[in-house]
Structures are given as structure tokens and as C-alpha cells.
Amino acid sequence: MKIIFLFLILAFYGFGQSPYGDWFTTLKAADLPLVFHIKKESGKNIVSVDSPKQKAFDMPAKITFSEGNNIKVEMGKIGVSFEGTYYSDSLSGIFKQGPILEEITFYKKPIEPKKVKRPQNPKAPYSYEQEEVKFENVEDSLLLAGTFTYPKNKTNIPAIVLVSGSGPQNRDEEMMGHRPFWILADYLSNLGYAVLRYDDRGTFNSAGDFASATTTDFVNDAASAVYYLQSRPEVDASKIVVLGHSEGGLIANILGTKISNLSGIISLAGTSIRGDSILKIQTRLMAESIGEKGAQLELTHAFNTALWDAVINSKNIEEFGVDLKSISKKFVKKFRKKKFIEKSEEAEIIQSVKMSMLNPWMYEFIRYSPSIHIPKISCHVLVLIGTRDILTD
């Protein structure tokens, strides 16, 4: 029987052939090509992962085979996993990153991308200036890369920094072929604003390590973007606004108290309640949206809640690690008793929970409450959220 842990793991069953070779797919949620290189060396199974669009190649990963031609690939540092079944011509299963789940199939040949018309994408020639820029996060000693657009032949220009949401994002916040930050930058610069958008640290042309970073680190990156705009001769340093999407909205709130002369902040689908509260709502809504219900859903929700409560009540991530082990064992036994999982899966599930939860970014996010900063914001504030948004409902 199959169970979906919306924060943890999926298990699939099937039959198949040899898994060795190069396997290609494209993640629909991010329009992101992905390649697995699976081989056997000195009697050991080895896998490396390419994300060509992100210019990331030969990333190390862990591979596990089990009965029924099941396969699992894990990249623990960035919370990514694939679990499924290998066949003679494909690998089919579930890709997971954080709470995001996607059914995908890998094939032996690269998948030709479908050409989709995007009439909303900006088209040259542009009516504004455009520069590829780099600016320094002095506190963390790293260079961030971005694009700076601004009206031609003007000075004292009001400016906007665009801050992306959670997960590694390029400067356009590109997903499924959509480039919302590019479109926003084009629209705003045509209206007379200077706009800076940048690649997340450790992503595309920005330096740093994304996998080990927390929201606090991303706040420092966004603050560095503001300081860079303040140094530009075209910009009116007293008229700078931070526009953040999702986690970027949370970051904007913090900057609203950290940078005293900030003109304003804009939160697009940002959060206003503590991380564990968001996740309790988010994971249930996501589960219901894909048809999960009944005892499986309730037990999964109870498991998640116990983990998040332990994070809140712990003094540090090391103390939480001790609690996590006992909580996981307790609930895995309950899943086994209800026959939602097989006994042979217990150890792997516990390990997957550990990899998902003992993550500095996740630990900080669960504990952080925007109520710490929101009452202290003194600049202008605009908050926008979609009525059908189940991620930050």
C-alpha cells in the first residue's frame, strides 16, 4: 500500500531491468532538465546528478536499490530525493524537494523541450538600459550576480530590489518556463523605476553555497542588493523598495526593520505566521488537493506536527536531533501497525525524515515568527496574496 508523507517520503513498487546508464528527464514544476548517471565501480553502485540549466554537473548523491527493482536517489544537502522503479527503458517515480512532490519519468534519451509561446516575455529592443552586474555581500564575503535595468538618461530614479522565494532561483525566478521577475523588471523599468534582480547565492552566476544557507543568510544577500542600489549614481537612495515573493516577502519584512532609510516593502504571497503554523496548514491543503484523506492523512499530519512541535520546543538543532529519532521510531511503528508501510521500509523512512528535518534552513524557518519584525516596520508596506494560493493560505 502506498503512503504519501507530504514532508517526508514516498514508496513505490514495481518490476524492471538494469538501472545502469544515463537517464534524462525534465521537472515540470521548474522546467528544469535533470540527468542521472548511474554506474557500478569496484562493486559499488554510484550515481551523480546533472542540472544543466543551473550549470551544475556531477553532483554527488546516494543511491539505494531494493526489492522489486525499486530505486532511491538522495541528495541530502539540498533535501532532494527521487524514489521509484526502474524498467528496461525508463525510471518512473516521485521527485521530492521539501514539500514539493512531482511524478516524473526518466528516459534513456534526452527529452526535447516543447516550444511554448510566452507572449508576456519582454522583447528587445528595450526602452531602458540593462546591465549585467555583480555586488558583494561583505558580511559573508561572496559576490552575487544580477541584472540592473533603469530608464535612459535619468537621475534620482526610484529603485526596487526583487527577492525570490524559497528554493534555488535564478534572477528571473524562472519556473515552468515562466519568468515572473524578468516580466516585473521590464514592466517597472518601463514605468520609470530602476530594478535589480539577482541569482540566489550558489545558483547560476552567484557565488556561495545555497544548500547550507538559512533565511538569515538570504536576508544578508538582499540587504547587500539594497546597499548596491544606494551606491548607484542613477538611483535616489531615499526611494528604494524591496519586493519579495514567498520567502522573499518574509525577507522584505526583516529588511523593513534592518535598513532604516528603506522607502517601502512589498510582500507577494509572503508569510505572516510562524513557520510551523504555515506548514501545518500548507501540507494538509496540499494533501487534500491530490486526494489524500482518511487515516493516512491524519496519521501523517500527526507525525509532521510532532516533529514541528519538537523543533519549537528544542534549544538547538542538536537537541532536536535526539527527539527526532524517538518521534520517528514511534510514528513509523504506527504506520506499520496500520499496514500503510512494509517493515522493510522502516529504516529508510527514518533516515529520510532525518535528512529532511535536520536542515539548518528548515530548522530556522519552522521557528521563525514574522510577528517579531512586522510590528517594528516603519516604512510603507504593500501586501498582496492570491485567494487560491494553498502554499501560503
Please report, for each region that a protein language model flagged, where it lies by residue.
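Central antiparallel beta-sheet cores of small beta-barrel/beta-sandwich binding domains
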Residues: S18-Y86, S90, I94-Q97, F181
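N-terminal cap/lid segment of alpha/beta-hydrolase-fold proteins
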Residues: E112-T155
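Short beta-strand element of the alpha/beta-hydrolase
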Residues: N156-S166
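Short amphipathic alpha-helix adjacent to the substrate-entry channel of hydrolases
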Residues: E174-V195
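Alpha/beta-hydrolase active-site loop
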Residues: S212-P233
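Accessory cap/linker subdomain of secreted extracellular hydrolases
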Residues: L268-P375
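Short beta-strand/loop motif that positions the catalytic acidic residue
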Residues: I377, V383-I385
